[in-house]
Amino acid sequence: VGSIYLIRHGQASFGADDYDVLSPVGVEQAQVLGRHLADMGLVFDRCVAGDLRRQQHTASAAFDQYHALGLPVPALEVDCAFNEFDADAIIRALLPDLLTTEPEALEILRNAAQNRSEFQRIFALIIERWLAGTYDPPGLESWLGFVERVQSGLQRILEAADNTQKIAVFTSGGTITALLHLITRMPAAQAFELNWQIVNTSLNQLKFRGREVALASFNSHTHLQLLKAPQLITFR
């Protein structure tokens, strides 16, 4: 039986001009992850990431720990199927109508720029609409389209894998959520309730044999918990 380890990227730069950059905390999370995996003796046959910088930087920061110990590291393969959905595009497309139909949304929005919990509230309302699929304007990647994209990436991995391989996939919370939805047949709304709980640099293990895939573990972040440093356990 083979294993795919879905690894969420480290904390990105919320509120900065460029979100797609690991914060100092995100870099530390990735380094801690790499040391933990190396200590476990977990050696990967393949390593895949999307083309987002936060995903690839998480991979490089983690595997720097392997290099320091002389452990083998496979070359990074890039597959854009594992990119996150475009949250900014979804917000731009769906926010105007939300503000006209949800009276509380405008007040939440006023506080969202500097307050992560308020941003989370408005974003959750927008995601509800995106999942419903009834508000999507032309050109916006739909939830169903996103799921199909992620599924195609998983299929490419499985087609090239044998049943003994260990494969690391450095990706994002939404991508992991889509795979949970596909593999467990969990309703999309329920899967997104779990999405909000996915910790940065958490491990989510899939077991596979041929085309059959099962969820083996979800949101494991023991590497962070062992440090007893709550500031390293982040969700955004």
Where are these regions (language model features)?
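Acidic, low-complexity terminal tails and accessory targeting/binding regions
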Residues: G2, A68, E84-Q114, L144, ...
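Beta-strand elements within well-structured catalytic alpha/beta cores of enzymes
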Residues: S3-I7, V48, Q165-T171
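Phosphate-coordination/substrate-recognition cap region in phosphate-metabolizing enzymes
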Residues: R35-R121
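Short glycine/proline- and acidic residue-enriched helix-loop micro-motifs
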Residues: P103-G145
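A mid-sequence, solvent-exposed acidic-amphipathic segment
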Residues: P137-I167
